[in-house]
Design a protein with these regions (language model features):
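Secretory targeting signatures
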Residues: 1-47
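Extracellular, repeat-based ectodomains that mediate carbohydrate processing or recognition
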Residues: 40-399
């Protein structure tokens, strides 16, 4: 997950700037030819830049004058996570390693402590934006997860090798933090704030169900919580990350046919489901959907639609209601997408990344199963080239 925000001042509806980067065939890691730990400035080009409206159609508006610097740290690391502390240090977690850069990505060093796991089945990382606590989560088979944490930019660590709630068999592990509320688990949280200021959440799949736990001791243990009841227990399980808003609202996205967000207002004690996106649906098999919240707790839910474009629905009342007319994020020229991610800053300022392809000539040709390819990235052959698309909007709340 990348924190990418840029300035844009438009007055005509929600406007999106899309920048296309780094071509490669197939799905997986993006590779460059520069040395490990170095940084490479992206090439300037007049192609691969789109300015679109909420329908994915092009607008006659000049793009932002953006410059990008890329680092190849961890380019072969599976399922990476990234976070930034208030000191400006960047933490990149993949496989069992925690890599740190305090010079804007120009150089990197490994800072994994002996209190952290030396093996992994699935990694995940999180930086608490309020306390700067760095969490390194390493799944140990399907039985449990080993979580270690640092409060001094990775100089020292503490850890718990069995730190994944009360119920074993976990997969698709996620961790996040957020403020305590005044109800549910928040009542106990108000008493534990002297130990750690924030609630810490740990969620995972068990079969097709979602389990979520809340920690009262800064992530050292997860004793409160269990299976989320409702749609998420019987249809798809967890696939997106956990998101917590500044007002304490928590969001989890299930892997279901109709785009859905599961919301808690009491630090994970109870959960409600909210659906949207019936106008665009989802593909099969269904992939990641994600939620981001801005500094005023407006929520932005993105997912891959049934036509393989990336779509968004917004909530301006802390997840109580969601717009039912979906906004297209990806340009119409992009006919296949996967792995969308979103982040938000000040109100209306969002950044989205995803992998996408414009190889429309491959539509209808045999896919990996020998069927006519419809644009579903899950079935794409190596003849389909995917790019990293980076999308910006400064007025994502406009109608």
């Amino acid at each position: 997950m990348c924190d990418l925000l840029a300035a844009l001042n438009m007055k005509t509806g929600s406007t999106l700037i899309v920048v296309m980067m780094l071509s490669f065939s197939g799905l997986g890691c993006i590779h460059t030819n520069s040395g490990v730990g170095g940084a490479e400035e992206s090439l300037n080009t007049d192609t691969g830049i789109f300015v679109t409206g909420p329908d994915g159609e092009s607008l006659d508006i000049p793009p932002l004058p953006l410059e990008f610097v890329f680092s190849d740290v961890g380019e072969e690391g599976a399922e990476p996570s990234i976070g930034i502390t208030s000191s400006g240090c960047i933490f990149f977690i993949a496989f069992e390693k925690v890599m740190r850069s305090c010079d804007f990505g120009q150089s990197w060093e490994e800072v994994t402590g002996p209190e952290c796991s030396f093996t992994t089945s699935d990694p995940y990382g999180w930086v608490d934006p309020v306390t700067d606590r760095i969490f390194n989560v390493q799944m140990q088979g399907l039985e449990t997860s080993w979580i270690c944490w640092s409060d001094d930019d990775g100089e020292s660590w503490l850890g718990n090798p069995h730190d994944s709630g009360t119920t074993p068999l976990n997969d698709h592990i996620k961790l996040a933090t957020g403020p305590w509320t005044s109800s549910g688990y928040g009542i106990g949280g108000s008493l534990s704030q002297s130990f750690y200021d924030q609630a810490v959440y740990y969620c995972y799949n068990k079969g097709v169900g979602i389990f979520c736990f809340t920690s009262f001791d800064g992530g050292a243990t997860f004793e409160a919580g269990g299976q989320i009841f409702g749609l998420a227990t019987s249809n798809g399980g967890l696939h997106g990350a956990i998101t917590s808003a500044p007002d304490g609202t928590v969001y989890v996205t299930p892997r279901v046919e109709t785009p859905t967000v599961i919301v808690s207002k009491d630090n994970g004690f109870t959960w409600d489901e909210h659906s949207m996106g019936e106008d665009v649906g989802t593909p099969y098999p269904r992939k990641n959907s994600e939620v981001a919240t801005d500094t005023q707790s407006n929520a932005y839910h993105i997912w891959t639609g049934g036509d393989e474009g990336v779509y968004m629905s917004r909530s301006i009342d802390s997840g109580e209601t969601w717009e039912q007319t979906s906004i297209r994020i990806s340009p119409k020229e992009v006919i296949s997408t996967t792995f969308p991610q979103v982040d938000a800053g000040d109100p209306g300022k969002i950044a989205i990344t995803y992998l996408g392809s414009e190889n429309s000539s491959e539509l209808g040709k045999p896919d990996i199963d020998g069927e006519n390819w419809t644009g579903n990235a899950h079935y794409a052959t190596t003849n389909v080239s995917y790019y990293l698309y980076i999308t910006f909007s400064l007025n994502a709340l406009d109608s």
